């Protein structure tokens, strides 16, 4: 029998009636429906928000048959008996979906709101087309309550899509949308007495910038521990519900069951929405891997939003920090303003970064990439922004680097690195900002080596920004450590560490770059030897190649490099 996996299914009714596999999330629904009244949930795109809203709609429409054998079936009956009311009561449900609009067009928001109101008003014998959207919404809620004698349920899917699609693209239109949505959503507060339940979902929380400033009765559950598992798939849910699919994937990829499980975890797990919560798998990527029987990047098929890349560049943000060295407090995580200096909160809310550690005594969250799918997908989209690598060609360029290193072609490899660095835009930095220019060089080198980690084992070591090793190496501009391919952790060494290390089947390549222009290739080689960078690799029994490179500021590229084999 073919297992029906719900890839792309967003209708709870369709999912249940057509026999698709369903991971029961109705305990969360029951808890929400019987506690607070107006909720907001922020989760990354393709994380199951629309399906959960559809499930809420089915519950509040009293569609008992759809919940057969689920947690909610028994819980609703017991709760109703305890409260002395009828179970499965039907409420008027107003469902506003922003998913379908193309909001770069100036009339798109008006079209979406008008369609919603034009569709709902006739159900309650209303005709209010001459009024503003906010006033029409108010009249609709009041009429639904008065004509059914039931409080209204309001569900809003992707409330922020009009703002995200215009951010950094058309700021004038973005501000217009912001003002209109503020007025529209404020109705939820003014009509509080007519509302039984309201649930808004989105990617970001445009909190104190105005949208929700009037909606102060909103409960944000985005980082509440008890709702951390509401969207996405936990490890237990994966192994309980998808065991046959994991085995099929393993057989197709010539892996053992445990190897397939480990690969899925490495690629799609790692999202944490509370420091004490459980890690979550991206459901879209997980289901895609099972349906297509291949582990690869699915979530990044639409690419990284251009405004995020632009904001990171405008803020001169040091890209290696994103892999585990970002720190924010709770307010920083949950609010967002559309300026370059505040890019990190939206990177977290949109799923590009997640909680890696909570520093309790300082109340700080340490963030990093959740998994390989996000790490490589994000960095893949950044390389063209920091070099002249054409968009859509990152994979080809990285493939050439990998082929060179596998074939032992050090000169060809370094010529490619030289070309990447020399192509970096000058950005009109003044002499006072030479460090920012140097940072762009280092970012490009970091991106190349980090992206190679998909195919060969690489280590990109970055340490204290203010450290002085006497040679102006990459260690001056970064901190932390990211080891890609099969690991992502910080290692403590008794010996020193080089800027970059690449391991192939038979060779370890140790690189040291003098990117600030105050050291030669010979100086870099001397530093590798003097600081014992190769010591930790000698036990592998592989050939060890040392590569030192010197930078020339006048030509803004690598002037020279030297390579030599370490004698055993």
Segment roles from a protein language model:
Residues 1-437, 447, 452-453, 464-468, ...:
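Phosphate-binding site recognition
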Residues 357-360, 454-463, 488-503, 512:
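Long, charged, glycine-rich C-terminal linkers/tails
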Residues 441, 494-498, 542:
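Short beta-strand or tight-loop elements
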Residues 445, 470, 500-502, 506-517, ...:
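Conserved catalytic cores of phosphodiester-cleaving nucleases, focusing on short active-site segments
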């Amino acid at each position: 029998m073919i297992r029906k996996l719900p890839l792309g299914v967003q209708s709870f009714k369709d999912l249940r009636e057509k026999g698709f596999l369903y991971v029961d999330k109705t305990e969360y629904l029951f808890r929400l429906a019987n506690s607070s009244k107006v909720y907001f949930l922020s989760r990354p795109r393709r994380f199951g928000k629309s399906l959960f809203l559809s499930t809420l709609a089915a519950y509040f429409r009293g569609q008992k048959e759809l919940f057969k054998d689920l947690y909610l079936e028994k819980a609703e009956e017991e709760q109703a008996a305890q409260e002395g009311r009828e179970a499965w009561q039907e409420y008027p449900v107003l469902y506003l979906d922003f998913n379908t609009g193309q909001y770069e067009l100036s009339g798109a928001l008006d079209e979406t709101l008008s369609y919603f109101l034009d569709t709902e008003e006739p159900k309650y014998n209303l005709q209010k087309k001459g009024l503003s959207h906010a006033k029409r919404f108010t009249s609709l809620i009041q009429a639904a309550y008065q004509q059914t004698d039931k409080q209204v349920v309001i569900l809003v899917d992707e409330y922020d899509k009009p703002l995200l699609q215009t951010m950094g693209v058309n700021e004038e239109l973005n501000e217009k949308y912001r003002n209109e949505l503020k007025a529209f959503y404020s109705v939820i507060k003014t009509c509080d007495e007519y509302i039984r339940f309201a649930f808004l979902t989105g990617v970001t929380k445009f909190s104190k910038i105005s949208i929700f400033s009037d909606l102060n009765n909103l409960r944000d559950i985005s980082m509440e521990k008890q709702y951390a598992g509401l969207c996405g798939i936990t490890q237990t849910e994966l192994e309980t519900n998808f065991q046959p699919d994991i085995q099929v994937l393993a057989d197709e990829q010539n892996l053992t069951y445990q190897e397939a499980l480990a690969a899925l975890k490495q690629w799609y797990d790692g999202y944490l929405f509370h420091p004490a919560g459980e890690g979550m798998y991206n459901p879209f990527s997980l289901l895609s891997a099972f349906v297509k029987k291949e582990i690869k990047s699915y979530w990044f098929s639409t690419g990284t939003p251009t405004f995020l890349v632009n904001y990171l560049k405008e803020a001169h943000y040091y890209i290696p920090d994103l892999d585990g060295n970002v720190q924010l407090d709770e307010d920083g995580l949950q609010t967002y303003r559309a300026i370059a200096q505040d890019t990190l909160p939206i990177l977290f809310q949109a799923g590009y970064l997640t909680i890696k550690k909570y520093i309790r005594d300082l109340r700080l969250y340490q963030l990093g990439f959740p998994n390989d799918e996000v790490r490589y997908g994000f960095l893949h989209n950044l390389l063209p922004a920091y070099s002249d690598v054409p968009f859509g060609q990152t994979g080809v360029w990285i493939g050439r680097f990998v082929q060179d290193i596998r074939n032992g072609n050090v000169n060809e490899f370094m010529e490619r690195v030289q070309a990447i660095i020399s192509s970096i835009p000058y950005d009109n930095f003044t002499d006072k900002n030479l460090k920012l220019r140097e940072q762009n060089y280092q970012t490009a080198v970091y991106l190349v080596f980090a992206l190679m980690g998909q195919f060969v084992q690489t280590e990109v070591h970055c340490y204290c920004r203010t450290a002085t090793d006497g040679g102006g190496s990459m260690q001056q501009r970064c901190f932390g450590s990211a080891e890609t391919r099969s690991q992502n952790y910080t290692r403590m060494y008794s010996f020193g560490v080089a800027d970059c290390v690449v391991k192939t089947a038979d060779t370890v390549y140790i690189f040291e770059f003098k990117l600030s222009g105050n050291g030669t290739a010979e100086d870099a080689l001397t530093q590798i030897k003097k600081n014992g960078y190769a010591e930790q690799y000698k036990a592998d029994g592989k050939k060890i190649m040392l590569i030192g490179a010197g930078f020339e500021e006048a030509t803004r590229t690598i002037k020279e490099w030297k390579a030599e084999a370490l004698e055993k």
